[in-house]
């Protein structure tokens, strides 16, 4: 699967980490930061930085809290993002990537440019 990821994207790489190391691996920024470059051909992109920021700001902890339903967790995560003045596209992209990684959805997230194009098309 790791070979396939090099041709794919961040959401698939995050799902690989969850499948190989468990959901709690996403709580460990150092582990994620060490693994992602190998999975993504050493491409540390804007999107990757956004995920690292989400880990640092406690977003993943909120998503993994067993006291929250998936929907409640996403709403609480959005509140944290908004308190940090994170743009809506960044919020949605990161939450969609993490939702895919956690198995909450089977919709793989595209590259950021493709994602933005789909959002713009959907909103028009």
Q: Which residues fall in each region the model found?
A:
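Charged, amphipathic alpha-helical regulatory modules used
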Residues: 2-119
């Amino acid at each position: 699967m790791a070979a396939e990821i090099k041709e794919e994207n961040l959401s698939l790489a995050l799902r690989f980490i969850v499948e190989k190391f468990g959901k709690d691996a996403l709580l460990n920024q150092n582990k994620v930061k060490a693994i992602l470059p190998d999975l993504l051909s050493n491409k540390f992109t804007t999107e990757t930085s956004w995920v690292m920021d989400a880990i640092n700001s406690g977003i993943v902890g909120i998503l993994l809290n067993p006291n929250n339903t998936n929907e409640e967790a996403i709403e609480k995560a959005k509140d944290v993002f908004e308190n940090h003045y994170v743009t809506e596209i960044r919020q949605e992209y990161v939450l969609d990537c993490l939702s895919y990684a956690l198995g909450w959805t089977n919709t793989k997230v595209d590259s950021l440019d493709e994602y933005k194009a789909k959002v713009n098309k959907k909103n028009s």
